[in-house]
Amino acid sequence: WFTHPGIQDFATGMDKSSNFGTLDIIEALHWVKKNIRSFGGNPENITIFGESAGGHNVLTLLASPASNGLFHKAISQSGYTSSFTTIEAIGVDSNGKTINSLGSDSILNEYNASSYQNIKNAYLENPKKNADQYQKYLRSIDGKELFETYKLIADKTFHRIPLATRDGVVIPLQGIQASL
């Protein structure tokens, strides 16, 4: 949310991420969980809700391991997600270090590790020269198998609590696969 090279030089631990807004919300949820009984609430039945940017915050909390156990249901109204550059979507930097654990790198490694590793390494070695080859490889993947692989990874990551986010139009009630 707020990052500046000057902050990064002195930041440690979680502050190094510069996700101060998300970290503040997580701290607030710790407080809620600790104190909710004083207000007649149940610390084992906490629902979070957000609209627009708040909906985005809900989705961010769902993706953050630091928020595990702090809430039990989530509602994201008009929340949004961000798109990634090609490098971010692949999920690794030029040194092969993971920068996006749910990027296409994780999914494609699950899908077909050996052939994907070869094409990914060629792309990372020279993105301009090998972009067409990488894109051709991605277009050759069977969509059904790829979505099944994505679903396996997503089930491990995101389906830990009930989430209200669909409207039946933007995301069909049958899920994203039904729209393809």
Role assignments for model-derived ranges:
Residues W1, A63, T86-I87:
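Non-catalytic cap/lid and distal C-terminal segments of serine-dependent acyl enzymes
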Residues G41-E44, H56, F71, N121, ...:
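Short secondary-structure junction motifs
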Residues I48, L70, I75-Q77:
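A short, hydrophobic beta-strand element of the alpha/beta-hydrolase
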Residues G55-S67:
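Short glycine-enriched nucleophile-adjacent loop
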